Amino acid sequence: MKKLFVVLVVMPLIYGDNFPCSKLTNRTIGNQWNLIETFLLNYSSRLPPNSDVVLGDYFPTVQPWFNCIRNNSNDLYVTLENLKALYWDYATENITWNHRQRLNVVVNGYPYSITVTTTRNFNSAEGAIICICKGSPPTTTTESSLTCNWGSECRLNHKFPICPSNSEANCGNMLYGLQWFADEVVAYLHGASYRISFENQWSGTVTFGDMRATTLEVAGTLVDLWWFNPVYDVSYYRVNNKNGTTVVSNCTDQCASYVANVFTTQPGGFIPSDFSFNNWFLLTNSSTLVSGKLVTKQPLLVNCLWPVPSFEEAASTFCFEGAGFDQCNGAVLNNTVDVIRFNLNFTTNVQSGKGATVFSLNTTGGVTLEISCYTVSDSSFFSYGEIPFGVTDGPRYCYVHYNGTALKYLGTLPPSVKEIAISKWGHFYINGYNFFSTFPIDCISFNLTTGDSDVFWTIAYTSYTEALVQVENTAITKVTYCNSHVNNIKCSQITANLNNGFYPVSSSEVGLVNKSVVLLPSFYTHTIVNITIGLGMKRSGYGQPIASTLSNITLPMQDHNTDVYCIRSDQFSVYVHSTCKSALWDNIFKRNCTDVLDATAVIKTGTCPFSFDKLNNYLTFNKFCLSLSPVGANCKFDVAARTRTNEQVVRSLYVIYEEGDNIVGVPSDNSGVHDLSVLHLDSCTDYNIYGRTGVGIIRQTNRTLLSGLYYTSLSGDLLGFKNVSDGVIYSVTPCDVSAQAAVIDGTIVGAITSINSELLGLTHWTTTPNFYYYSIYNYTNDRTRGTAIDSNDVDCEPVITYSNIGVCKNGAFVFINVTHSDGDVQPISTGNVTIPTNFTISVQVEYIQVYTTPVSIDCSRYVCNGNPRCNKLLTQYVSACQTIEQALAMGARLENMEVDSMLFVSENALKLASVEAFNSSETLDPIYKEWPNIGGSWLEGLKYILPSHNSKRKYRSAIEDLLFDKVVTSGLGTVDEDYKRCTGGYDIADLVCAQYYNGIMVLPGVANADKMTMYTASLAGGITLGALGGGAVAIPFAVAVQARLNYVALQTDVLNKNQQILASAFNQAIGNITQSFGKVNDAIHQTSRGLATVAKALAKVQDVVNIQGQALSHLTVQLQNNFQAISSSISDIYNRLDELSADAQVDRLITGRLTALNAFVSQTLTRQAEVRASRQLAKDKVNECVRSQSQRFGFCGNGTHLFSLANAAPNGMIFFHTVLLPTAYETVTAWPGICASDGDRTFGLVVKDVQLTLFRNLDDKFYLTPRTMYQPRVATSSDFVQIEGCDVLFVNATVSDLPSIIPDYIDINQTVQDILENFRPNWTVPELTFDIFNATYLNLTGEIDDLEFRSEKLHNTTVELAILIDNINNTLVNLEWLNRIETYVKWPWYVWLLIGLVVIFCIPLLLFCCCSTGCCGCIGCLGSCCHSICSRRQFENYEPIEKVHVH
């Protein structure tokens, strides 16, 4: 709960001006206390039994309550300002349907605001709605508008009944309420409460609208309708829950102090989340944290909280064992009490009680130590000692006493004592600082009294628990227990509020597990080494215990020598025996050690890389000797005497050792012929395998390896081992691997894991090709399990995304696919341009990276590999891991959003994007059937670039298959089956598995190879849709590309011939490039100048794919670096050293590995920034080169752009730019324009089209030609624009003015000169003599032979590539000369003579034919006359004609 202590506000008494109402009533309603009591009983129902607590919060008050009756208008509303909370109630007396009023409450904030809209449907299950959304809410609404349409990104959109149980009879006894804070909103609705945590700014302004009845007349007769209780301040109520009865009453005495210091212990011993932790401090044995957050083990699990108003004069005793918990406030636990905390709230400056104030600590062994402080430094005045609580009136000097003798000076008491905490292990804390440490403590007693001052005590019996603690000014302000799955994530992320997203799941601590040991079978001999330490103790002049340096150490005798003892057996066990004798003032130690002189001998680590108490923990050596002399020793142990007040080093025990496996320290005797190996298979076990220690799961594999005894990864982790007796290979995998938990609104809704077992309390699961997904979403059994995620598709909107993974609010898992679009048809231009005289058609290859593979790193897993002690040390680095993980996650999310917005696929275009569709003649229109398809001689080379449908990989071209087959990854974990395969544990892990084991998880990206292929295929299909106006599948791809070629101004008289030449050259170029892709990869690591664009593109692909894998491999290898620690294995360090010494060594590993992680993150973020720019370039290339024809020279290939095609490539796209490269140029003298004069008038003519150039030819005539191709022609008047004059105006400016005119102007010469002047040396060159010259002979014969071998190999490769280069160079296309110059010339004389003869001959012939033929001609008339003379006239017989009607 957010605010356990309820605040009640006292309002001013005058509100008439703020309530524009028809009628305002300010009076006490009859059932107001019943409403408040019911509200508080409901609120405190979560309190455990046996609770007596004061609640303080912004809760409803007894008065004032306001009733506002308004007229029937929506235009007016009531506004209140500076509110902290608001409560309202609906009266039910004498109310009919017409009497009912609706209400709209608006709480204004930024960026979120709140609206609560109530209708007149009192008996409905959805009669009202609450909205917490971004936006500007309306002040009024309509009865039917139960929606949150006014806002966006709603935190709460919930409909609820107005009356409990949907019955109007239940109305009137429940309050509605709203509380708003900077990080939380609390809503009380229909008896239920809602708490929504988010950051927001609130103005405190509340608006009431729509407070009206059905009619004005009815409204005027009402008295009790909506009643409002605005809250401005804190109020207090006392809730007593005893014997099953809860009593609510007003709090009148020490309410604020009670709220600040007393809480009700929650079930499980938890302190309420809204407790203020007044005067609670973070206990520390070292430096004190001023402000910040950290995860630590602190005594914050409360077994019993005892509120004590005051103490009696007599002394009180508090024991750790058998403490009576009869007066506890709230829940009671029976855990072992670790720390008793005394907390005091004081209201005056000095709170010292009457009489002596002494803390008595009853330590084990019956020795009682007393702690007290004095106003003077002389401890003889101990009888006047005291420990005052509160602000002291001067310095107080504190001592530890025994039987009236000051044993130790502790220091000066803090100026203000607010808390004293004492642990059963002998630590005495004041305000959180470890003031004193002694032997374990049984009981505490003191006679501290509070006198007559206003003091309030609490005594808390607490146990240690892990928690996320927020500290401000050295005091605890907030605690989050690491006691649940979601809280564990909060602790690992060091934040109390989790934003929506994916978070690595912190590995669970491994409890007591079985011990597995693997050793070589052998005949073992065993030696027991008994070391006896005799301590000598005496008192100083002031009575303090002192350990004498005359204390002796006795080793077993060996070869008549007791100074050195060497292990000569295979195994050994070391045991220490300690004795203690005391003396008075001499050095004769005969008496037994009693009281404060009692001491125990301990052997500390000293300078050795292993601890003495870990020698019997299967540590192995080649040689091991103990010595009392430093001669020949490698290191030493410190032998100390531990008393109740301190530790004193008395002697040193020296060690002579060599690392190896011949000697093993064991806990017990195992002599004889044995295979001492003990294996616990298929369960988490603490192992020691041939000296390699750690925690993991051992599984038997089917692998057979001839060589090796054990096998490690590049990071040094143990991956497997061999049983030398039977040759069986066993794998070693971590007990748990990293998982990614999906958190939405502070709740875990799902988790990504490689293990098919329940985790985080999630039971429902589905599987993907890459991992398992567990969720709160119920994947029902009727869906197919163990198959692709498509079988479990859920129609929902993902709230959080990572890579191509999305999770909805209900926990359902979805894949984020490429955006699908219908695609706008972009028609291709059909204009004509001229062609060069000679040029080369070239297909140039360019690779551009589009995306990177997202990587998730579990920082704690990488740094600590699951070691619980290391994880605790890691929390001292505050937000280091959180920063690393969030940087990778945010970078991946940003890139995924950009890539997702870039990739879209047109379904229509995708259907055309295949060789099969383009080659199909069945779908072609008749007008195009005469065109050859791709399989013919038209553009056969396109078949290598265009995608092809197949059963395995759809939409892939031949070149794409070559690219994905030839590019070899190194060190990068794939996302196919590796993640799940690695955790199977039935094979020895490879590098990829080692990465997963160390928390490095490679996730599938938004854009993978198949999606990129679909995208590029859709681009190819889009070209077809746009060809010649575009007609579905009616146009083959060759025609679409040919339309692009036509645009290059091929003249009509040689069009067919030139097209055939271009097609042949293109086919030859593409064919050779395809071959080179298959062969040039072998020459990338050599120095080859052949096939420059192909080699460069493929090399870049190889580099892009491997650069991340190499970075991950380097990051994994860093785990093998010990960073100046004694070992790179954390488990090995803790196995060899005591905890304190091991912490220091592990701290070095943590620092080094965090540095390696920071370097990797910096490299990744830098790489992502580069890829972001590269991705934008790829988008520009797609739009300008693929979807259209570029006019820029050099952007789409190095030449005049014809067309481009894109293919998918690893992590990006590869472009094939078809360009024209001119090989011959015509040099002309260009003219900017013509200056003409006509008498006194002068004007200029300039060329209208900037793409044309005016020049004078050799015949001294002017022509125009395009700048891109030499095509001279005679100019026309339409080519020019007239200007007024021919004068050229210049702007006069100094050099210093140029940057203001040309911002990017830099005078290079001046800049270089300035640099040389600034760095001119001010020294003179010394004169060196070469009288003596020492030369060193360097034998490089082997290196030269190796270079010659590589050179020969390179030569053979380049010979093969030279053939391909020649083939590509043979694509030179010599087109016909298309340049024409229009001129007028005179015909020679013989031409005119020939014309005259033709005319003389033809004219008489034409006249004769015309006059002599036809009916009117001479010949025709003569024939007619002859015919009439020689023959008689005859008449034909005619039949009678009838009239015929034609219908």
From Swiss-Prot:
The keyword Metal-binding does not apply. Residues 1-28 form the signal peptide. It is found in: Virion membrane; Host endoplasmic reticulum-Golgi intermediate compartment membrane. Residues 1303-1400 are annotated as: Heptad repeat 2 (HR2). Keywords: Coiled coil, Glycoprotein, Host membrane, Host-virus interaction, Membrane, Signal, Transmembrane, Transmembrane helix, Viral attachment to host cell, Viral envelope protein, Virion, Virulence, Virus entry into host cell. The keyword Acyltransferase does not apply. Gene3D superfamilies: 1.20.5.300, 2.60.40.3130. InterPro entries: ALPHA_CORONA_SPIKE, CoV_S1_C, S2_sf_CoV, Spike_S1_CoV, Spike_S2_CoV, Spike_S2_CoV_C, Spike_S2_CoV_HR1, Spike_S2_CoV_HR2. It is a single-pass type I membrane protein. The KxHxx motif seems to function as an ER retrieval signal. This is Spike glycoprotein.
